[in-house]
């Protein structure tokens, strides 16, 4: 048995090669070369087929628009430039189109509508020039708008009424000037000479909607003290001696309380501050005079507002005064147990067309009440506002003439009853 280490491999003797015979290529490298040639030919065929399909679907001018076509790339070496003649595309037919006319503008019927330009059928030019645009049709003329067209139509009667109202206001303001507290106090002093039962209460500082009730109660308390022979507890008037004031309280039967009102302030201190500011400016602003008559003899509270409801509605004011009348029955009871009644005098706006005649209207109403307290003189007022203020102007002129000789802020001397 032969061991593998000692075994001798038997090989065929290799004949000596002859250097004169050519060396033949083996079959395996030859097959690889054929495969490469076949692959290259197949790739070239696919490229040719693809380009052919592309040329079928796209024209040469479309191929030029692609970004990857005919692009120049920077190169260090100069390469020959191959110019391919490209046929120019045929120019499109230029068809003139009319421009869109502007939208119609609505104007007055008197202005005729703008004529619509006639549109001619498009014509094909033989040799159009692309650079020259087609002529545009003429535009329709725009209607000219005047200032009268922009303003809304207002009837002539409205202007006539506005002019008449403005003229009426100017006439009324010229007839009846605004009355301040000094003239009102002088008017009260003049009324005292005609009706001694009226006490000329000072109007500066005037009562307000916030303190007129306390002022009336204080005066009635002082009147009771004078009738008992006791000293008064309230404050004395600025321009009246204590003896003269006691005589006035003893013989008075009617208290004319003038109230100064402004709609802005909501407290007594704010009202006084507003009054000072308006006095410095010399303007009445939105201030208003009101009148409350306390008729002690007739046991009646009379409220007069020439603007009718400037402070509050007449119904609310009547309820407030009725509650106050019950309080006065306790403060100043009558010997026959008669209670105070309440009357709202104005049934409409009295001072139509005037904003500064409230003080004069309060004095006029007080004069009517003193003359006849049981006749309502407001029912006989003229309907026309100018005629109404003409009558008021006559009263104002008579009062201003009567108070010229009266001293400034000085109480008249009251006569002693006993």
Curated annotation (Swiss-Prot):
Transmembrane feature ranges: 40-60
Function: Effector proteins function to alter host cell physiology and promote bacterial survival in host tissues. This protease possesses deubiquitinating and deneddylating activities.
Name of this chain's protein: Deubiquitinase and deneddylase Dub1
Amino acid composition bias (Polar residues), ranges on this chain: 1-10
Gene Ontology, cellular component aspect: extracellular region; host cell; membrane
Annotated membrane topology: Single-pass membrane protein
Pro residues composition-biased segments: 86-141
Region named Disordered: 1-23, 72-144
Active site per the UniProt annotation: 288, 305, 358
Family to which the UniProt record says this protein belongs: Belongs to the peptidase C48 family.
E.C. designation(s): 3.4.22.-
Keyword Cytoplasm: no
Origin species: Chlamydia trachomatis serovar B (strain Jali20/OT)
Keywords: Hydrolase, Membrane, Protease, Secreted, Thiol protease, Transmembrane, Transmembrane helix, Ubl conjugation pathway, Virulence
Keyword rRNA-binding (UniProt): no
Gene Ontology MF term list: cysteine-type deubiquitinase activity; deNEDDylase activity
Entries under SUPFAM superfamilies matching the protein: Cysteine proteinases
Pfam families assigned: Peptidase_C48
InterPro entries in alphabetical order: Papain-like_cys_pep_sf, Peptidase_C48_C
One GO BP: protein deubiquitination
Subcellular location: Secreted; Host cell; Membrane
Predominant place of localization: secreted
